[in-house]
Swiss-Prot record:
Transmembrane segments: none annotated. This is UPF0434 protein PST_2635. Pfam families: Trm112p. Coiled coil: none annotated. Belongs to the UPF0434 family. One of its GO terms (cellular component) is cytosol. HAMAP family: UPF0434 (MF_01187). PANTHER family: PROTEIN PREY, MITOCHONDRIAL, ZGC:162634.
Amino acid sequence: MDTKLLDILACPLCKGPLKLAEDKSELICKADGLAFPVRDGIPVMLESEARTLDVDERLDK
């Protein structure tokens, strides 16, 4: 994913920052505890497509 795009993207719910997961398959919002999928390099920023982070993922810095 293009780093310039990542700089301007925000969580669609809280408008907070997103972090690209290490495997680059998800954008993580720590504030809401959600992971938005990245499919074929395109972020899917729909709440209905996001998964809830588990406790370990929420605590991971």
